[in-house]
Amino acid sequence: MADRLTQLQDTVNQQAEHFCNSIGILQQCSVPSKFAGFERTGSQTPQQQVHQQQQLPQQQQQQQQPQQQEDFPQLFSTLISRCAKDIDTLIESLPSEESSIELQVQSLQRLEAENKESAEKLEEIVRKGELLLEKIQAALSDIAQSQLDMQYSS
């Protein structure tokens, strides 16, 4: 599992993706608007522009039908708000600057105590394992000696 800073970075990147995707959907669903002084586009004549403007509402209706079925604004607002809550939670879980030295010292002391306890347990397990190994080797030696004695007596 990633540390808190990496989680925070991933969540901020995810939030940026949500913003970019929502802007893309807005651009895709938006209706063209007119600007004063820019009524003629490129090399189109006024008649071509009128014909294009008449076709535009039909195209918009065709494009908006499937998009109205899917509620993109609701989806992205939910995603963005959830992500913002996650970011807030991750930020709150980070250690504060004032108590970071004290917390680090306490944490290190606790870790050292746990490490010492684990080392003692490990040493005890190793000691028991070595005793068990000696017993097994002695038993195997006795078995081997017994087999040799049986072969020579036959």
UniProtKB/Swiss-Prot annotation:
Component of the Mediator complex, a coactivator involved in the regulated transcription of nearly all RNA polymerase II-dependent genes. Mediator functions as a bridge to convey information from gene-specific regulatory proteins to the basal RNA polymerase II transcription machinery. Mediator is recruited to promoters by direct interactions with regulatory proteins and serves as a scaffold for the assembly of a functional preinitiation complex with RNA polymerase II and the general transcription factors. It is found in: Nucleus. Residues 37-71 are annotated as: Disordered. GO terms for biological process: regulation of transcription by RNA polymerase II. One of its GO terms (molecular function) is transcription coregulator activity. Residues 44-71 have a biased composition (Low complexity). This is Mediator of RNA polymerase II transcription subunit 21. Its main location: nucleus. Belongs to the Mediator complex subunit 21 family. Component of the Mediator complex. It comes from the Eukaryota. Keywords: Activator, Coiled coil, Nucleus, Transcription, Transcription regulation. The keyword Flavoprotein does not apply. The gene is MED21. The keyword Transcription applies. Residues 96-140 form a coiled coil. Pfam families: Med21. One of its GO terms (cellular component) is mediator complex.
